[in-house]
Amino acid sequence: MLDIKFIRENPDAVRENIKKKFQDAKLPLVDQVLALDEENRAAVSEANELRANRNALSKQVGMLMGQAKKDPSKLEEAEAVKAQVKANADRLAELEAKETELAQQIRHIMLQIPNIIDPSVPIGPDDSCNVEVQRFGEPVVPDFEIPYHTQIMESFNGIDMDAAGRVSGNGFYYLMGDIARLHEAVLAYARDFMINKGFTFCIPPFMIHGNVVEGVMSQTEMDAMMYKIEGEDLYLIGTSEHSMIGKFIDQIIPEESLPQTLTSYSPCFRKEKGAHGIEERGVYRIHQFEKQEMVVVCKPEDSMKWYEQMWRYSVELFRSLDIPVRQLECCSGDLADLKVKSCDIEAWSPRQQKYFEVCSCSNLGDAQARRLKMRVKGEKGTYLPHTLNNPVVAPPRMLIAFLENNLQADGTVKIPAVLQPYMGGTQMLTPKQ
């Protein structure tokens, strides 16, 4: 969400940004919010004048009532002033109700206007225009056929999607045995990896209030992702970023405590009602998964430095697991409305001979802070912090990349050295079938 003052002073820049994001249908919102803002400021100005006059008129009534004891003619004048005081009070009540209504209308529109993207963001309508920046690690081109990832898991008796379908429907799975151990090992390794980078480990709430949802994401994202608890003001989180950033709602953060660097574990729940939907056969896009997340709350001048550092953490972690990756700069049309800048980290799939998304690092500027009324108190006053997020690792997508890149010709799966302590010293997984 932008500052209304910024929109007021830079309407053309806001319109141009909307065009860069290929959201021309939102262009009328700028004029709408400016008209409402002008109407609201007029109401506020009139209300302030009435409040200022209220005390003066009240004093005048008191003075006239005192004079009326000696001069009865003053009583009529006092009653006239009393009538004016009542009329002003009635008008003030009308104006205050109008201000409340206008503020709600303005906020509703403001929540739909996208954040100003960074000048470095490539311009394009959708993810087909995302730009490859660099690659890390040599892509594996095996001389043997790599099965589909669920077939690899099934060779270890490690997954049962049929049973999950009977219990929960499509988009769920049972992980078992070595694959379940591997899943937990990757999460534990990712947790310790971030702790060693200086991040504070946290397990957050897995359900959040509606005002937190509104504060961390757009309505479009909310409709496509979030499960609501029936009869409660609670939503299941789609990522722990939601509850981690929500931790600071309505809070004043001491400047000396910045940056806040947090890494969190949580299950994640998603409706996946967007363009892609859930995957019919595999575990790439599903309704429930677990994830280790990283979140940073920092000074505005430090956010781009943290952005660079955070996506590099993802690259370092994936490379430590012998998975080649590449960085992809997200274009304007692929950025969610709150994002200033974002890049995807994609892992190499030897089976498909192409890369696929496993992480998305995002700088949201002060958008979430403004929505959630977060403030930082420093020597020069208060200001809005910047927020950033990036998945450390999100099994089962990580498992797809891990299994394909560490699969051997005989069906065994090599366990990289960094992961072996989390697998009880196991160096190789041997298929059961």
Region roles according to the model:
Residues 1-139, 154, 158:
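N-terminal alpha-helical targeting/anchoring segments
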Residues 27, 135-433:
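TRNA-recognition modules of translation machinery and tRNA-sensing kinases, especially anticodon-binding
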